[in-house]
Amino acid sequence: MPYPDLYDEPTRSRRRPWWVKMFLVVVVLAILAAGGVAGVIWYVAQDLPPLNSVTAYQPSLVSRVYSDDRQIVGQFFVERRILTPLSDIPQSLIHAVIAVEDARFFEHPGLDVIGIARAGWMNLRRGGKVEGASTITQQLARALLLSPERTYIRKLKELFLAYKIETVLSKEQILETYLNQIYFGQGAYGVSAAAQTYFGKDVAKVTVPEAALLAGLPKSPNNYSPYKHPERAKKRQEHVLTRMSDAGFLTPRERDEAAAQLLSFRHGMPAQTAPYFMEYIRQQLMAKYGETAVYKGGLEIFTTLNVRMQTAAEQALRNGLRQLDKRQGWRGPLRTEDIAKVVASAPPPSDTPVKKGDTMEGVVTKVGKDHVMVQAGSIQGKLLFDDMAWAKRRLRGRDLARDVIVAPTVKGLLKPGDVIELAVKSVDRDAVSFELDQTPVVEGALVALDPRTGAIRAMVGGYDFSRSEFNRTVLARRQPGSAFKPIIYATAFNAGLSPATVVLDTPVVYEQEDPDKTWKPENYGKKFHGMTTLRSALTHSHNLATVRLLDKVGVKSVVDFSKTVGITSPLNHDLSLALGSSSMTLLELASAYGVFANQGFRLEPYAVGVVQDQAGQILGQNLFAPRQVISTETAYLITNVLEDVVQRGTGQQAKSLARPIAGKTGTTNDYTDAWFIGYTPNLVVGVWVGFDDIRSLGETESGAHAALPIWVDFMREALLQLPEVPFEIPENIVFVTVDAATGLLAADHGDQSTVEIFLKGTEPTQSAPPRTDSTRFYQIDQGIDGIGELPAAVQP
């Protein structure tokens, strides 16, 4: 039998122990796992976005618009964000955010292992996800660099990016970027916009309880909104205060005191200031700088808008249009509803009390002999007949410019179930009295300019921007009627005529190209005034005298002069120009009057003075350069005559302002347009009133009746900001006593004489004949159609 090999071991002794096998398995698995992790890391690392969005942080910023006294009056934005340095953010807000979002922010390298473990334990104990573990740096990486998808790969990318961010930015830089980036709800991005949105204050003035409220919002802005869910918002604020106390930022006493304070929230954003003006400059900015710069570039836009004047302009126009609309009569109830249903569905009394002037809809519930009862929401009130008597019906007469007025009765106006517009007249304890109201359908516009600079101080392009965004100050071309006449008379003065030059205001017929047609202009009221001076003709707005003057001065001369003073709209090249038949915008006509107010110097109207980028670099600036386009003497001559329009003519209502004022009314055929353009040495203001669809405003609704009251109401407030200064008299203007009827030297200084102004060298040298000399009328009639020989410079 063979001997066993001494070197052979038993089979059992050659088997590896189990722990060796286990060790080998673990090693292999570890290698595989490490390889897998390395592969995942490699894969994730290959697809990481660059850090440019973080290291060169350029968020979408609000472009802010400022008034002439540096008040913020508007904003343009995609995301309402105001970039704020960390040094300008109060410590209480910084502490609140850190405490609730990432208490170990200054201790970890971008991902917080301890925080992850704590959050996992808390979630395990409470049986669900009640606490997150994302650090501030992770949230920043997610917001700036990653898509919103919820996948494990995205989470890994978030961790890697957070670590990388911590290697290139300081903790302070990360925190500043985060506080400017995060969304707080209500359209507010970043802490500054959030402070303005919720509390209406600068972020630097935020208190501890307010800071805690804000810090609790980013987790879920909708769920913790103090407007939608006040109880949840309060609990969230208390949670933040507790975390601040746990982190050592507050003592327990400070925490309790902060939690006990009542917060006052800003309810709704304020109504946009000067919406027509804002849209006007927005279009200009978009054309010059582009959409990205305007809506995301954080531009600082300094405008010419005067807030007090703008407010006065809006109120004056709205009040004037409402009064005019009521003069036109009532258009009837809005609709009819079932009274029982209205009363049954009336809401509970509101915590907000009504006040005088508030407007609302109401339903007529009962009709009496001299009053009606109305239900307006939760309010029951009375409407007396005297407070609805304006609601007369207007019946169109045969003459398109005339209406027949029919007086109303209560039962003739209203019946139960009628839905009507109401305005609160008075509130006496629990009793509310109403007056019948009506939203105007008539439109209007007002623009105010500083003639010395061209700066637009106020602009209202219509009754209500939300109803119509069409800006009637710059887009609506309408016939100015007699408001154009000063340009014709200024052309004559510029050519050497004087306010004392006489002209015949008598019937005249002009042949047209068609031999079967003639044109016969008429005066307002169909009256004639015979021989009259240019001063009197313009003061009293005589059409026939103006047509004769235009005929002799020359249409081309007036058209050229119009362009010189700023009229850019095309003008009719015929004698109808004398009656203001050529359409133009309110802004261009007001700007033309500004040349008269500014002693012959023209400046282009402008609304934006300076535009800066977010770093303060000037991108654009209005460097206004005045150009003298007519002589100082011509400007004063026309101004002096237009002062007479206010003192003795169609603009007499403006006398109540007791300031040096010049101006002119304008009314077109059938009262379709009403104008008043007036000025002082430091402000020129134009008002237009009319329907968009060009129809009559009604009989008597002339410029003096429809537009001038609005102008006066505005100027009463606007002039409070401006010093009283006289119109400066040029050296070459001389004063001469003349005969009021003929414009010649007065034979005596009795009642028939007046002091007139002349450009030196144009004053009369011939004395007026005795009034009994009837041959004088024959002599005048033998002149050039009632004006006499014109200077050579203006011979047609």
Locations of the language-model features?
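Active-site-proximal helix/loop microenvironment
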Residues: 262-263, 270, 305, 564-629, ...
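Active-site beta-strand/loop architecture of penicillin-binding DD-peptidases
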Residues: 277-293, 444-479, 490-491, 597, ...
